Amino acid sequence: MSDLLTGIKNYQQMFWQNPNKLSADEALARINFSFDDIFEAQKRLQRFAPLIKKLFPETENGIIESPLAEIPRMKQEIEKLYGGKIHGRLFLKCDNYLKVAGSIKARGGIYEVLKHAETLLLENGLITLEDDYSKIAEERFKKFFSNYKVAVGSTGNLGLSIGIMAAALGFKVDVHMSHDAKEWKKKILRDRGVNVIEYREDYSKAVEEGRKKAAAEKNTYFIDDENSRDLFLGYSVAALRLKDQLTELGIEVNKENPLFVYLPCGVGGAPGGISFGLKTIFKDDVYCYFVEPTHSPCMLLGLVTQKFSAIHVRDFGLDNITEADGLAVGSPSKLVAEIANILIDGIYTIEDEELFKLLALLKDSENIKVEPSAAASLKGPLLVNSRANAIHISWATGGIFIPEEIYREMYMRGKSYLKDVY
């Protein structure tokens, strides 16, 4: 462990196999979530589909889902870049194309906003579960929601998903943003009437202050990325949908055809919820790996030290400064760290420079636009020992909303780094 910690402290790229992982059945028996919870979340999203279709006509019948794309040319580019071999097929889960919010956070963030809205409406006798929820778009419901506020702390993408959906329903919205949040993300929110509160400190401080402010206000609901069960379950629904997508492609996951999934990790809610869903469905035939920046490996440190959320990367001399803004988190979620400890297969870390190289290669090889955080998932398939019939899925967490001029800068930066390699 001392070698591992030394490497982490020196900002080295590390690959860690989780020695505490239990079999899926053992782990799931100890976790305070069940398949029924995932199914309930899925049903709630289906109830809201008519409303989402009305508010966001660009969605497919009100279901916010992303394509699963095989990326054979990118597979070759990754092998060429790192001089290794990826055994099996490589797919990209394109949450960078998710409608409404443009990132993986559309799954958990939007789900929790909808659940809160439904709870308020049911408690006030304004709807029943059997109603056509498209009527919630009517002005009288917006007027009702305007008496309530939704708040969240975010480095960017979670704030976007919650801000966009809550504002569309009529809620007042506060988004507490850390110093690393990108200006263009703040602009999207302000353009929708969201109150953006900026901090000079990091993500943990933005969440702490947001939580404190919300607790002191009447009718304010704080979505707590560090501890939220609802966010976690919103993400877990992705596993049900991924299973359907694999079935449509004629892919059956089993012991002979294992599934490897690589998930960028900030505080841990999205990768944690998705891993829980995947392990619930595919059991020990799926292998889940998180990826973090070398400057912000909060989940890795939490699990390696077994201190879980009671650490900050600064405790280890790390600066928590990374271009992967969605992953710039100093302390992991308590809820997720304790689950990941017995559930996930491992974690690897990646340098910022690699993110830009992979971002540029993905654009050149497959014409797919992702943000740096999303590109982190692309190196994983090269690091694990897998067999020839493995299915690898790199989870692209965001990117479609990046303004073109900013994306162009990222792309050119990646190209300049690649010049030194090729």
Swiss-Prot record:
GO BP of this protein: D-serine catabolic process; isoleucine biosynthetic process
Modified residues (N6-(pyridoxal phosphate)lysine): K105
InterPro entries: D_Ser_am_lyase, Ser/Thr_Dehydratase, TrpB-like_PALP, TrpB-like_PALP_sf
Transmembrane segments: none
Cofactor: pyridoxal 5'-phosphate
SUPFAM superfamilies: Tryptophan synthase beta subunit-like PLP-dependent enzymes
Cytoplasm keyword on record: no
Catalytic activity: D-serine = pyruvate + NH4(+)
Domain of life: Bacteria
Family annotation (Pfam families): PALP
UniProt keyword terms in alphabetical order: Lyase, Pyridoxal phosphate
Top EC group: lyase
Family annotation (NCBIfam families): D_Ser_am_lyase (TIGR02035), PRK02991.1 (NF002823)
Family under the similarity heading: Belongs to the serine/threonine dehydratase family. DsdA subfamily.
Protein name per its UniProtKB record: Probable D-serine dehydratase
Source species of the chain: Carboxydothermus hydrogenoformans (strain ATCC BAA-161 / DSM 6008 / Z-2901)
